[in-house]
Amino acid sequence: MSQVSERAINAGLASADPEISRLIDQERHRQETHLELIASENFASQAVMQAQGSVLTNKYAEGLPAKRYYGGCEHVDAIETLAIERAKQLFDAAWANVQPHSGAQANFAVFLALLKPGDTIMGLDLSHGGHLTHGSPVNVSGKWFNVVQYGVDPTTQRLDMEAIRKLALEHKPKLIVCGYSAYPRTIDFAAFRSIADEVGAFLLADMAHIAGLVAAGVHPSPVPHCDVVTTTTHKTLRGPRGGLILCRDAEFAKKFDKAVFPGTQGGPLEHVIAAKAVAFGEALQPSFKTYSQQVVANAGALAEQLISRGINVVSGGTDNHVVLLDLRSIGMTGKVADLLVSDVHITANKNTVPFDPESPFVTSGLRLGTAALTTRGFDVDAFREVADVIADRLHHPEDDAIRQRCLERVSILCSRFPLYADSKEPALV
């Protein structure tokens, strides 16, 4: 082997690219020393990350197991088959495709399989907690299809199933989408099934945010009620960043397989699929149910404590991992609140709230989630303290003494609940 190739292949990251290595160390330090409350984020296990960083990244494997267009796929076939079988077992599904690169890719594949440009779809308004891929005008789903958006009730801030039914009867959509990115309440998938049947629509559940809760049995499953279910594999499922499609009908399964490849993707990411398999295996363990129950309990405690401190919570609470603050109650925008909590090492995101008068770049809300810190071991009492830190910072934005105290409390919490207990905090250079 030449010196050049030996150096290129065998050098570790720190010596091969010290700049990237340093930035990764800094990001790990940030994760260790900040409170992660972004609802769509979580911390993958060492095992998941090791699978994703394996030699599988070298392998091309277009097609499905035992139906590849490349040789040398015997081991990735076994890995992908294991991922499929674990996904089916985890969600009690008849079929699964583990190849989508993301939740958005999974949704696009479903659209390709079931719809034609110009067809009518129904999805929750983005400002009410929906997702870009459910028909937002800035997304391809909003450009290719005729989109009818439903919303939440202005008083309860919950889904009004009768209003949704009337809208569906009026517009006769070909596809109804349920499952959201900022909706903190339990979704009645059976009621959506009834509406879809009444108007002759396909029913898609995008359970990206609640997949882990569904897998653990702490949120009702959409699989028995929906024609197709999509999800990401991170968030509450705590796997690698990727997508997944599930269904219970063999005829649909063939369409979805073709819609993924060759319809919307080329070669699958087998290193990510291996990491998905590991995550599915973790989620099949009894400890994952305990974890998911704690996620929901922690969210309830976070919401209750923030309400007690005079901060409004959309819908008055939560049934899942999401706590959505309506900051109009304290005369603050989401943009300002995001900056204030970030300044004391709490990571969240500004978010629209139902009937928000502000633009999506400003917003009136702050979205919080409990999945990541629950992975670190945070319990109900710890989350009550997190709520107090947030409330102190938002109620006293100009008080530097309170800011310093918030920083100290965050630091103590991070020390009490280390992220990766077997890893040493990297030295920063």
Curated annotation (Swiss-Prot):
| Residues with PTM N6-(pyridoxal phosphate)lysine | K235
- Which cofactor(s) are needed, names only? pyridoxal 5'-phosphate
Quickly give the catalysed reaction: (6R)-5,10-methylene-5,6,7,8-tetrahydrofolate + glycine + H2O = (6S)-5,6,7,8-tetrahydrofolate + L-serine
Q: GO molecular function of the protein, one example?
A: pyridoxal phosphate binding
Cellular component per GO, a single term: cytosol
Q: What is this protein called?
A: Serine hydroxymethyltransferase
**Gene Ontology biological process terms in this record:** glycine biosynthetic process from serine; tetrahydrofolate interconversion
Subunit structure and binding partners: Homodimer.
Residues reported to bind (6S)-5,6,7,8-tetrahydrofolate: L126, G130, H131, L132, S359, P360, F361
User: In what pathway does it function?
Assistant: One-carbon metabolism; tetrahydrofolate interconversion; Amino-acid biosynthesis; glycine biosynthesis; glycine from L-serine: step 1/1
Provide the function of this protein: Catalyzes the reversible interconversion of serine and glycine with tetrahydrofolate (THF) serving as the one-carbon carrier. This reaction serves as the major source of one-carbon groups required for the biosynthesis of purines, thymidylate, methionine, and other important biomolecules. Also exhibits THF-independent aldolase activity toward beta-hydroxyamino acids, producing glycine and aldehydes, via a retro-aldol mechanism.
The record's subcellular locations are: Cytoplasm
This entry's Enzyme Commission designation comes to 2.1.2.1
NCBIfam families listed in its UniProt record: PRK00011.1
Family statement drawn from the similarity comment of this UniProt entry: Belongs to the SHMT family.
Looking up Pfam families in the UniProt record yields: SHMT
Q: What class of enzyme is it?
A: transferase
The record's keywords, sorted A to Z, are: Amino-acid biosynthesis, Cytoplasm, One-carbon metabolism, Pyridoxal phosphate, Transferase
Q: Where is this site: Plays an important role in substrate specificity?
A: H234
